[in-house]
Amino acid sequence: MRGSLFAVVAFALSLGGGAAAAQPVPAGEPAPVVMAQGYTLASTVMDQPRRLNVWLPPSYAEGNARYPVLYVLDGGEGQDFHHISGLAQLATISGTMQDLIVVGVESRDRRNELTARTEDPRHVQAWPTHGQSDRFRRHLAEEVIPFVEGRFRTSGETAVMGESLAALFVVETFLRKPALFDRYIAISPSLWWDYQRLAKEAPALLAKHDAAPRTLWLSIADEGGTMQAGIDKLRAALTSGAPVGLKWSYRARPGENHATTYHPAALDALRELYGLPPYWDEKAPLPWWLSDEAPASAAPAK
């Protein structure tokens, strides 16, 4: 554990469970409802403090079990951390998914952190700070993941999730550094970037993969254009040249657009990758309280 790399400051976020107990306050006074803890890391890779948000399932405090970790890109308080960790929290209530640790990795300059460098003048003019995805990937590999694994009881099983540019980063990481995570969830990835260069390079990059077991979960909204063209190229590369150990799937979401697809698609992804069997036998007869038939003794008196 690279403890010397980090100056870690814990701060409470708003909403939820799995953190320190709330302090009593006078009646009628507002009190924060704590759902997670935040940490500030003094990153040497990014050369600035970086924020992580961590949600722990309630069972974390009840024993010594170890948990898989889901890393959520764009995982700041005002980004996607709350609604994705909320899916994990709901699953603990309903018992529908495996308990997870959810780590939100905040982004500051998305074009800088989530895209690869291009020399195309139109991209350079429109987004002059772009192109540092390699550095951000080093931040995850050398700082974020070691911090999480050193501080929390993790099982060693990891997943990364993102949407739009964050999903582009997920796909790039899967193709270029596949051993960094076990599971990759990319929702409406912006594969239009740099004229679909990453999708066009996919066949050659896949050919370099080993046979280790990994999962790639892809989804796209009803977007068309170069968004759809890019993911179609990636799908073609996977169909013809997926590594032996890879399980991959694709889910089109024709009823959604780029602004609405993330939350429902994320729920589908988590259900497929971490779902638990229902607590009842779906093939068994319905229990009596769900039956339409009422016994004669239950009929109202006349």
Where are these regions (language model features)?
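Bacterial N-terminal signal peptides
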Residues: A7-G16
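Positively charged n-region of N-terminal signal peptides that target proteins for export
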Residues: M1-S4
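Non-catalytic cap/lid and distal C-terminal segments of serine-dependent acyl enzymes
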Residues: Q23-K302
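Sec/Tat signal peptide C-region and signal peptidase I cleavage site
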Residues: G18-A21
